[in-house]
Amino acid sequence: MVKTTAPAFATGRSLGATSIRTDHGVTVVAIKRPGEGFTYAAADTILHPGDTIIVSGKVRDTERFAELS
C-alpha cells in the first residue's frame, strides 16, 4: 500500500468513472480530505485536489501510480 495525493487526471470525477484500476493496476482503498480523517473509498466517491489517498496493488504499480501525483 502507498499513501499519495490524488492525481490531477482523476480529480472532479468519481472513482468509478476513472480508469485507475484498469490503467494503473491499483485500487484506491481510502481517502483523506484536508482536516478530516480517512474514509473508505467507494465507486461513487469524488476525488478532490489535495485529497490524500491510499492505494493497494503490486509494489511496482503502486510506486508508479504515486509518481503521477
Task: Please annotate each region the language model reported.
Residues 1-5:
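Short glycine-/aliphatic-rich beta-strand segments at the starts of folded cytosolic domains
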